[in-house]
């Protein structure tokens, strides 16, 4: 059994999802959103860092998947997204989690079967795979999808690749 944290980073809303990976698949543990409000950027980044740190302390995941930054139309938005991502990554690194990064296309492919899936299709597959009866918030749904993608990728790497990386004290990069 492995607890996996998925993070959908954002400078205003960061989604998180925690799943338990077992021999039979994945089970839902928790999900939600870290809302930073509209303060100064450094204050919002601190909220993301503390929020992710609290989630890690509460649930005890051993690994984290996080979405890569995509090039947005607005360069300022892409920079802020990258900074929020960095705050989440530092929180996970401080806690000793293994960290893997995935593109949005990789996440959609792993969860919905096509890299061109829309948010609604991804959410419906997340609900189906985790046997959820209510729709999660969209950012939480995306984070759960990232956690599921990470679980799927991990299961294809175990036992050889991940075990080797862990033994050598290295970081697994996907």
UniProtKB/Swiss-Prot annotation:
Active site per UniProt: 8, 67, 139
Record protein name field: Crossover junction endodeoxyribonuclease RuvC
Entry note: cofactor: Binds 2 Mg(2+) ion per subunit.
Subcellular location, record wording: Cytoplasm
Enzyme class name: hydrolase
Keyword annotations: Cytoplasm, DNA damage, DNA recombination, DNA repair, DNA-binding, Endonuclease, Hydrolase, Magnesium, Metal-binding, Nuclease
One GO cellular component, as annotated: cytoplasm
Signal peptide per UniProt: none
Organism: Pseudomonas putida (strain W619)
Classification of source organism: Bacteria, Pseudomonadati, Pseudomonadota, Gammaproteobacteria, Pseudomonadales
Cofactor: Mg(2+)
Family annotation (CDD domains): RuvC
Pfam family, one: RuvC
HAMAP family: RuvC
């Amino acid at each position: 059994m492995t607890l996996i944290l998925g993070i959908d980073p954002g400078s205003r809303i960061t989604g998180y999802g925690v799943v338990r990976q077992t021999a039979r698949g994945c089970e839902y543990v928790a999900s939600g959103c870290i809302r930073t409000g509209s303060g100064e950027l450094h204050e919002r980044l601190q909220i993301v860092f503390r929020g992710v740190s609290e989630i890690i302390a509460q649930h005890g995941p051993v690994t984290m998947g996080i979405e890569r930054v995509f090039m947005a139309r607005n360069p300022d938005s892409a920079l802020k997204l990258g900074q929020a991502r960095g705050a989440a990554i530092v929180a996970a690194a401080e806690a000793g989690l293994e960290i893997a990064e995935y593109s949005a296309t990789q996440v959609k492919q792993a969860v919905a079967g096509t890299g061109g899936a829309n948010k609604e299709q991804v959410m419906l597959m997340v609900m189906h795979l985790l046997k959820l009866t209510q729709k999660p918030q969209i950012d939480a749904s995306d984070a759960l999808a990232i956690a599921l993608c990470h679980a799927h990728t991990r299961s294809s790497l175990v036992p050889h690749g991940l075990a080797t990386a862990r033994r050598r004290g290295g970081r697994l990069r996907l």
